Amino acid sequence: MSEKKINLLDLDRKAMRALFADLGEKPFRADQLMKWIYHFGVSDFEEMTNINKVLRQKLAARCEIVAPEISSFQKSTDGTIKFAIHVGEGQEVETVYIPEDDRATLCVSSQVGCALECTFCSTAQQGFNRNLTVSEIVGQIWRVSHFLGFAKDTGDRPITNVVMMGMGEPLLNLANVIPAMDIMLDDFGFSLSKRRVTLSTSGVVPALDKLGDALDVALAVSIHAPNDELRDILVPVNKKYPLQEFLAGIRRYIAKSNANRGRVTVEYVMLDHINDSTEQAHELAKLMKDTPCKVNLIPFNPYPGSPYGRSSNSRIDRFSKVLMEYGLTVIVRKTRGDDIDAACGQLAGDIRDRTKRLAKKRMQENQISVTMN
């Protein structure tokens, strides 16, 4: 039985250099290889012309460069593209490309499903199977870059920003997310600015502290409720890490980070008559008074079976004005890709659930019903 080959997309620069040392090669050779992979999108060792033939043969014998395949894609009327990415065992995760005038953002998944059970999110309703590997995370960027047109002659890449806001909670897959983000930031990797790579979390506080010790990237935090009572229902991880504990962790991260320019982005989904009252706006503003932030209000994007509705424009406008009265910077997110179920909270994929999600779902729906009445 032949030995399983090493997928080089699983290795950040430190691990790549360790591999090359094991091959008896100098560190700069590892850097050359990474440049071929991430700057020029090359997966065939024979195309790497500044690497000698003997080393190319060694690499071909022991290693491979394999990204997950695109199973299908849908294009929105606004230019957004949703990709279904095959990750084995008949499962798919979803990745979303969002073009804008001054940037091109890829929304990347970190898990096959999600274990956090946020009640307004389509991904959570699919259950959870496993964490994505490093190669499956960076492979989303690599594969979509090829789809969009990797410029092999110049190294120009079609993706300028990456947001870890796809399927899954990134901080529950820290062992793979950290090296994947290292590759995104590395000069020999995707070479993205730390301000152009954003991680979004619902509040796994110990892992947030570990992230701050390991990396400096932009941070977005999913708050979604102005108090623990409501957040316990909307974002159940709040029962383990309540708001004040989460906010303290956010402030510790800000103190370590340059990428955030002294503040984080607060994400707040607008659910009709659930968390969008004027009183709740005052409550949110007071909650955030000691945490430097800008607030991103996200109109809820419905999905089949959801118990929630989208807040009206007038309610969103009133909520926004209250926050601004407290001196907060407020942005109402423009919905992109909702006609192809690619908008925030709509990603679902194809998941083999390993949790008892469906049994719990009925209990959550009962809680929501009580809150709405």
UniProtKB/Swiss-Prot annotation:
<dbReference type="InterPro" id="IPR004383">
    <property type="entry name" value="rRNA_lsu_MTrfase_RlmN/Cfr"/>
</dbReference>
<dbReference type="InterPro" id="IPR027492">
    <property type="entry name" value="RNA_MTrfase_RlmN"/>
</dbReference>
<feature type="active site" description="Proton acceptor">
    <location>
        <position position="94"/>
    </location>
</feature>
<feature type="disulfide bond" description="(transient)">
    <location>
        <begin position="107"/>
        <end position="344"/>
    </location>
</feature>
<dbReference type="GO" id="GO:0070040">
    <property type="term" value="F:rRNA (adenine(2503)-C2-)-methyltransferase activity"/>
</dbReference>
<feature type="active site" description="S-methylcysteine intermediate">
    <location>
        <position position="344"/>
    </location>
</feature>
<dbReference type="InterPro" id="IPR048641">
    <property type="entry name" value="RlmN_N"/>
</dbReference>
<keyword id="KW-0949">S-adenosyl-L-methionine</keyword>
<feature type="binding site">
    <location>
        <position position="200"/>
    </location>
    <ligand>
        <name>S-adenosyl-L-methionine</name>
    </ligand>
</feature>
<dbReference type="GO" id="GO:0019843">
    <property type="term" value="F:rRNA binding"/>
</dbReference>
<dbReference type="GO" id="GO:0030488">
    <property type="term" value="P:tRNA methylation"/>
</dbReference>
<feature type="binding site">
    <location>
        <position position="121"/>
    </location>
    <ligand>
        <name>[4Fe-4S] cluster</name>
    </ligand>
</feature>
<keyword id="KW-0408">Iron</keyword>
<dbReference type="GO" id="GO:0051539">
    <property type="term" value="F:4 iron, 4 sulfur cluster binding"/>
</dbReference>
<dbReference type="Pfam" id="PF21016">
    <property type="entry name" value="RlmN_N"/>
</dbReference>
<dbReference type="Pfam" id="PF04055">
    <property type="entry name" value="Radical_SAM"/>
</dbReference>
<comment type="similarity">
    <text>Belongs to the radical SAM superfamily. RlmN family.</text>
</comment>
<feature type="binding site">
    <location>
        <position position="114"/>
    </location>
    <ligand>
        <name>[4Fe-4S] cluster</name>
    </ligand>
</feature>
<keyword id="KW-0819">tRNA processing</keyword>
<keyword id="KW-1015">Disulfide bond</keyword>
<keyword id="KW-0479">Metal-binding</keyword>
<dbReference type="InterPro" id="IPR007197">
    <property type="entry name" value="rSAM"/>
</dbReference>
<feature type="binding site">
    <location>
        <begin position="222"/>
        <end position="224"/>
    </location>
    <ligand>
        <name>S-adenosyl-L-methionine</name>
    </ligand>
</feature>
<dbReference type="GO" id="GO:0000049">
    <property type="term" value="F:tRNA binding"/>
</dbReference>
<feature type="domain" description="Radical SAM core">
    <location>
        <begin position="100"/>
        <end position="339"/>
    </location>
</feature>
<keyword id="KW-0963">Cytoplasm</keyword>
<feature type="binding site">
    <location>
        <begin position="168"/>
        <end position="169"/>
    </location>
    <ligand>
        <name>S-adenosyl-L-methionine</name>
    </ligand>
</feature>
<feature type="binding site">
    <location>
        <position position="118"/>
    </location>
    <ligand>
        <name>[4Fe-4S] cluster</name>
    </ligand>
</feature>
<dbReference type="GO" id="GO:0005737">
    <property type="term" value="C:cytoplasm"/>
</dbReference>
<dbReference type="GO" id="GO:0046872">
    <property type="term" value="F:metal ion binding"/>
</dbReference>
<comment type="function">
    <text>Specifically methylates position 2 of adenine 2503 in 23S rRNA and position 2 of adenine 37 in tRNAs. m2A2503 modification seems to play a crucial role in the proofreading step occurring at the peptidyl transferase center and thus would serve to optimize ribosomal fidelity.</text>
</comment>
<keyword id="KW-0004">4Fe-4S</keyword>
<dbReference type="GO" id="GO:0070475">
    <property type="term" value="P:rRNA base methylation"/>
</dbReference>
<keyword id="KW-0698">rRNA processing</keyword>
<keyword id="KW-0411">Iron-sulfur</keyword>
<keyword id="KW-0489">Methyltransferase</keyword>
<dbReference type="InterPro" id="IPR013785">
    <property type="entry name" value="Aldolase_TIM"/>
</dbReference>
<protein>
    <recommendedName>
        <fullName>Dual-specificity RNA methyltransferase RlmN</fullName>
        <ecNumber>2.1.1.192</ecNumber>
    </recommendedName>
</protein>
<keyword id="KW-0808">Transferase</keyword>
<feature type="binding site">
    <location>
        <position position="301"/>
    </location>
    <ligand>
        <name>S-adenosyl-L-methionine</name>
    </ligand>
</feature>
<dbReference type="InterPro" id="IPR040072">
    <property type="entry name" value="Methyltransferase_A"/>
</dbReference>
<dbReference type="GO" id="GO:0002935">
    <property type="term" value="F:tRNA (adenine(37)-C2)-methyltransferase activity"/>
</dbReference>
